């Protein structure tokens, strides 16, 4: 009996390790989506950087999974990529990296964090809404499921 229990624990530990091996992709996808939303009007202002930093650092899951400096570094990398078309396409590819993982839950979480970033100032701009729709399409997420 204990041998079977030991095997079950080992198998569970391997699953947890497999889940954590994707964490870098998750953080990169979150920061890519946030950068795309922040750049919706074609430029990322200091206030938008602060808004993204505030949303990401206070997010209950992200703040437990990643150190603040890692979140900030990753976000800054994604902000730099958002400056031109090839960089924005690279950001879109970051979204592809998590599409379909965890039965789509990871993609939904990325979309919801992008929505939080867009709504952080209390106003969803038309450009931000358009980018959110593109993010949802890229992730294979139905945004109408989150209209609460």
Model-inferred region functions:
Residues 1-36, 43-148:
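Small-residue-enriched hydrophobic alpha-helices in membranes
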């Amino acid at each position: 009996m204990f041998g079977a229990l030991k095997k079950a624990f080992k198998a569970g530990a391997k699953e947890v390790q497999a889940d954590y091996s994707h964490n870098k992709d998750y953080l990169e996808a979150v920061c890519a989506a946030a950068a795309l939303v922040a750049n919706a009007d074609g430029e990322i202002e200091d206030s938008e950087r602060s808004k993204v930093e505030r949303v990401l650092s206070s997010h209950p899951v992200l703040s437990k999974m990643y150190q603040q400096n890692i979140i900030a570094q990753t976000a800054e990398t994604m902000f730099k990529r958002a400056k031109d078309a090839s960089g924005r396409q690279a950001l879109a590819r970051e979204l592809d990296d998590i599409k379909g993982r965890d039965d789509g839950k990871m993609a939904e979480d990325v979309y919801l964090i992008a929505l939080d970033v867009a709504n952080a100032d209390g106003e969803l701009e038309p450009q931000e809404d358009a980018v959110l729709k593109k993010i949802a399409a890229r992730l294979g997420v139905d945004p109408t499921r989150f209209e609460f």
